[in-house]
Amino acid sequence: MTAKATLLVLALVVMATSGVSSASVAGGPVVNSDTVSRSDPERLSTRGCVANCQANQTGIDCIKYCGIGIGRRDITQQ
């Protein structure tokens, strides 16, 4: 992966995780269970995240709420 592509992916991940605490961005996406459980309990489950990824085609919901691999793969393919 070129440096430009790496920066683009990092920028997308930062944008996708902007609603999450800044500490989680440095170490990768981390679930803030308090926020997620109040907004949408289904997103706490892997099945819910996969369904959101498939529905949105971007995987941003997966990264923001669960940080699972399918979301990262979808973003790098854009």
UniProtKB/Swiss-Prot annotation:
Keywords: Amidation, Disulfide bond, Neurotoxin, Secreted, Signal, Toxin. The keyword Disulfide bond applies. It is found in: Secreted. One of its GO terms (cellular component) is extracellular region. The keyword Heme does not apply. Residues 23-47, 74-78 form a propeptide. The modification Isoleucine amide is found at residue 70. The cysteine framework is XIV (C-C-C-C). This is Conotoxin Cl14.9. It comes from Californiconus californicus (California cone).
